[in-house]
């Protein structure tokens, strides 16, 4: 297990998102976002959720499925209070001057859309895929549905317009799909070992996780899409 405690911290790089604290470190000459485990919102018996493990495992599964995916490393970090936590390091894929543009930001440029960039309605997302002009729409459409299928396989309940996108070089006027990232909501991160065991021993619990939940964060008619229905 890698110990990231003594890695140099870049205090001038900060990150958004509500899923755990994050800092920027340098490890073996490269920039990484270090993600800390968030407190679970549902399972009060857990000190921290398994989001870091989910991030690491899900990203590697995406990679095995043929997706270009962010590089992730599991490790630990001891804070100033002496508390050691399991963390995941996500390599900065904007090294080299490219800029990440979330799909939400690109969708905001589609002035014919009825919703803003973070609008979750499937029809609005597909319209934006057709209307945007920085990437071939047929390839983007294919990527969107491939990612949707992989997210369904991994039980990702939080893939939204703000956690996938493009790497852009404005000077060269070029865009490419960003590696898949932000997979910490896959693989039921708030299930502890005992509850995992209970699910695996109960066919009704397994069926619920196939047919009922998790749902996609994308909506149709204002209702979250059932992965099974697609």
Regions found by a protein language model. Give the residues of each.
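Residue-level signal for well-ordered alpha-helical segments
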Residues: 2-4, 38-39, 46, 130, ...
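Short, flexible loop/turn elements at secondary-structure junctions
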Residues: 38, 76, 92-94, 148, ...
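Conserved ATP-binding subdomain of kinase catalytic cores across diverse folds
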Residues: 1-113
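Active-site acidic catalytic loop and adjacent metal/ATP-binding pocket
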Residues: 143-183
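C-terminal catalytic region of ATP-dependent kinase domains
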Residues: 63, 167-230
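ATP-dependent phospho-/nucleotidyl transfer catalytic cores
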Residues: 89-149, 171
């Amino acid at each position: 297990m890698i110990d990231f405690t003594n890695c140099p911290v870049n205090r001038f790089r900060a990150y958004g998102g509500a899923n755990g604290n994050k800092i920027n470190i340098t490890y073996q000459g490269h920039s990484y976002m270090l993600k800390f485990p968030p407190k679970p919102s549902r399972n009060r018996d857990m000190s921290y959720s398994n989001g870091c493990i989910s991030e690491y495992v899900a990203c590697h599964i995406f990679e095995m499925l043929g997706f270009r995916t962010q590089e992730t490393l599991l490790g630990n970090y001891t804070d100033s209070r002496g508390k050691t936590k399991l963390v995941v390091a996500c390599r900065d894929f904007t090294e080299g001057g490219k800029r990440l543009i979330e799909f939400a930001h690109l969708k905001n440029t589609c002035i014919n859309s009825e919703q803003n960039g973070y609008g979750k309605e499937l029809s609005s997302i597909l319209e934006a895929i057709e209307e945007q002009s920085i990437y071939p729409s047929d390839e983007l459409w294919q990527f969107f549905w491939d990612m949707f299928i992989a997210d369904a396989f991994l039980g990702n309940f939080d893939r939204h317009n703000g956690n996938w996108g493009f790497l852009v070089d404005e000077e060269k006027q070029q865009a490419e799909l960003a590696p898949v990232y932000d997979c910490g909501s896959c693989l039921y991160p708030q299930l502890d070992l005992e509850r995992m065991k209970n699910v695996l021993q109960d066919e009704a619990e397994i069926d619920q996780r196939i047919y009922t939940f998790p749902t996609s964060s994308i909506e149709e008619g204002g209702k979250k899409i059932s992965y099974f229905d697609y």
